[in-house]
Every structure is written in structure tokens, then in C-alpha cells.
Amino acid sequence: MIKQDLLLQHIKSKKVKYKTFIPHLFINPDGMTLEDRINPPEGFSRIQFDEDDFPSFIRNFPLKEDGSQVYFYNGMIKPNQDEHVAIFDIDIGERDLQQCADSIIRMYGEYYWAQEAYDKIAFHLTNGFLMEYTKWRDGNRLLVDGNNVSWNHTSEYDDSYESFRKYLDMVFIYAGTLSLSEESRPIDLDMLLPGDMFLQGGSPGHCVLVVDLAENQQGDKCFLLAQGYMPAQDFHVLKNPKNPQDPWYYASELSYPFITPSWTFPEGSLVRWFDE
């Protein structure tokens, strides 16, 4: 007791001040977009893009309420709810179609649809066939004979969103990580932009989408990743396994094999989808 009393007297005499530690808050539960929901790390600011660019589109895409669970296409709750920090508010359909590559195709398709850039909505299928939305809109439908695919005019012109969704579902059936690999090219980490992917083509393969990017005054960058997965499920923003409290991935810490919650990517998997 004497030693404790002396210690207390010493503290009072030195006027020792205790500072309250306030942790950095990464999640704003009231935010309904990436920009408003997930705060950048302390000392970092989001890199700004033109409002009509894809990075701004996905940064401001609606999210489901904070704390929402990831659901499968059949209405069942995904057993593992520990991998995500946010969920994009976009339907996944009622069939097991919108998986990993399909989710990225969906976001690019929705972006071009919102921009009314209909000529840019075109995706290669796994066999190399280019499936153009404008041909679908004009009434053409796929004629599949084994590995051979061609257009067959069987319907009327239809530019409705409902028809556009049917087009995307057909793309999901015949496209995947293998076709996405053929449309993409490797990039260096210092070139990273929202819309780039970590992609490993295969059966199965996997891909995740870079959905946001921030930078500090020293030029260090960090980014957010999102994914769909198998079976088809909500498109969700991933946690960082290295720090579950901080969803940002830091370029300075990135090494290969690159570990994400659902997949480990090899070197050379960082790619950009080239707009040909």
C-alpha cells in the first residue's frame, strides 16, 4: 500500500495526463454508398475522378443497409458472414448465374447502360463469340450448336431494362473467368484504378473488382475490393484478412501470393479490362 500511495503522489506531482485513445472509424453505418459508408484510412483521401467515369459510378452505387447479410440466389443466407463489410444493392436474379466474373460483367454493363453507351455493352463468351447488346436489343438471339454460336433473328426490337437483364443472364451462362482473362491485360500496381481486377482464369477460377482507391500525401495508395462468388450471391465489399477492422488493402503491403477472404491470387493476376 505504501508503494502504491507513493506512486499516486508521484503521478499527481508530475501532473501526468492520460489521453483517451479514439480508434479511427472506418464504417459510417448511415452511409448508403461506398463514399459515404467506408471512410478512408487516417491521412488518406479518396482519389477524385470525373463524375461520368466508372470509378465514380461504382463509388456512388447504392448499398444495402449496414449490417445486411449476404444471400444466395435461392434466398438462403450464406453461412459465412465474416468476409464482408458492405453489400451492393443490386439484384442477383433467381438462378445460379451471377457468380464472380458475372458480377463484374454486371457492374460494367450497368455502368454503360446508365451512360446510354449501348454500343459498349459487348462481352466475349468463353468460345470467343462477341455477344453485343445492340444485336440482342434488335431482336437477335443466340443459336448454340455445341461450341458454335451465332445470331438468329427471332424477336422484335426491345430496348427495355427487362430485356437488358435477360441479355446479361445469357452472357452469364456462357462467359466466365476464362473469357474475362482473354479480354484483360496485366498491369503494374502503380497503374491501379477502380475497375481493375485481380483475376485467375480457370474452371473454377475467381476474380475480385477494385471498387475504390485512396492516397496519402506521400503517394501511398490503398484500395477496396468486392466480389461475387459461387453459388451466385450478393456482390459484396471484402474485409482485409490482415486486419478485419480495416477493410482497405494497402499497396505497400501487397505481396504474392495475394490473400483475400475467398481466394489466393498468384503474381500476374492484377489486370485491366481493355475496352477494345
Where does each model-flagged region fall?
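N-terminal module-boundary/linker segments of secreted carbohydrate-active enzymes
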Residues: 3-80, 94-98
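Extracellular-facing segments of soluble proteins and assemblies that are Gly/Ser/Thr-biased and enriched
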Residues: 89-185
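Residue-level marker of positions within ordered structural domains that often coincide
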Residues: 109, 215, 230
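Substrate-binding/catalytic groove segments of enzymes
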Residues: 113-116, 207, 216-220, 234-236
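...with weaker cross-activation on analogous glycine-rich loops/strands in unrelated enzymes
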Residues: 161-219
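Low-complexity, Gly/Ser/Thr/Pro-rich intrinsically disordered linker/tail segments
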Residues: 221-276
